Amino acid sequence: TGEIYGNSAQISGNGILKSTDNGVTWSPLPSTLSASIPATHQFAYTWRALVHPQRDSQQVYVATSRAGLYRTTNGGSAWTPVLSSNALFSDVIVTRNGTLYAAFGAFTGTQGAIASRWGVFRSTNGTTWTNVTPPDMKNTVKRIVLAEVPQHPEQIFVLAETPDEGAKGSTIYRGEERFEWHSLWKYTRTSADTGTWENRSANIPMTDEQRGDFYSQGGYDLLVKVSPHDSNLVIVGGTNLYRSTDGFTSTKNWKWIGGYWKPTPSFDKYSSYKDHHPDQHDVLFHPTDPKQMYSANDGGVYVTDDIRADSVAWRDLNRGYLTTQFYTVDIPNMPGFETSRKIIGGMQDNSVWFQNDEEEPTTTPWQRVGGGDGAYSYFVTGGLSYSLYYSSQQGRVYYVRNGITGKESYRKRIDPIGPKDYLFINPYVPHPTDQNTIYMAGDNQLWRLNDVDLIPAGNTDSTLIGWDS
């Protein structure tokens, strides 16, 4: 448990949970619990718990944050440190022949400090370790993740955020272009003590699309996995998910298969790949069906029935998985809508959604209105029916004009040029009697839009039209 490197918060866990009935029930291991809350010991933040498949289930390895690698040989009753490091990021895997690999970034969380142990390490017994770090990996490396090659237990893939080294990708964050560098290696063990590294960083996915480049948000979302059915089918993930069918030996055979997507329509700056979600954390291949793969990300769990398809299709498996968090909700409060069951709401990391069912709102699917982190949203009088204001993070506000049947006539972006320092979920409110007027907080000022109808339909960016402060 514990998340040391969240997008918006650092959340202390409290130890490790164990199940002895195939995941039906879970119990905390007393040896990993902290006497204080929030927890401060070595198990307050863990990156991975690994049961050794070739030993019995009593042998478990745990990669921690700032406390290195720990091992238990008695099912968690007691733990022994086997590889110390104060690195913020760590990982551990085991190959099909029982060889263990551990990784530590050089980043400690303190600017300028270098971890006491960083790089990639190999062990055949879990107690003695050999440093096999790629020779061109530098002590600026941040997060490192590892993947076995199931068909070839002498091989692994290594993906890392490597500032100023490797493939340079960009994204748009708070209206500004941001850059990150990542590196990808393949390691082949050639003898008991030696191996060779192949740097495949030049083939990390990059596109000409907004939010199409490989980008991991400082290592927050970072994964690499190899299919157990085909050693050339390799998946990498950051904000987006990508598939290669030649092990990233070239730039010709990879596809963008999840996460963000090309802005459609152009005003939706946070369009998502259909039936998928940004910020990738893991994938799992089906053990017997070579086409089926599960994807875990900030939106939950998704599955595809054909990972090799030219256009990969996903199914959402989050029904009944009750983690949705609404920042705001609104219901119609206008003449003619007194008995309406319509609802609109902005969800944490899950867009703005709208329920348009007048009969039974508990059974009709909701409709996605806009992307990003859903924020303040309102029903208002407008046109021949009702209209909508909705917003996403950092003060982006939109207006949807509906026709007499309630169908969308047009939409436009309406937030003002000028304010820079918005709250992440930034408030604004329509005037109670003139709902073409809204008031909005921005920086240390109050802004007023005098008439939303002045802004042209289809506008896709911030505007000066109609605003004063």
PLM region spans:
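Beta-propeller blade termini and top-face loops
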Residues: 1-469
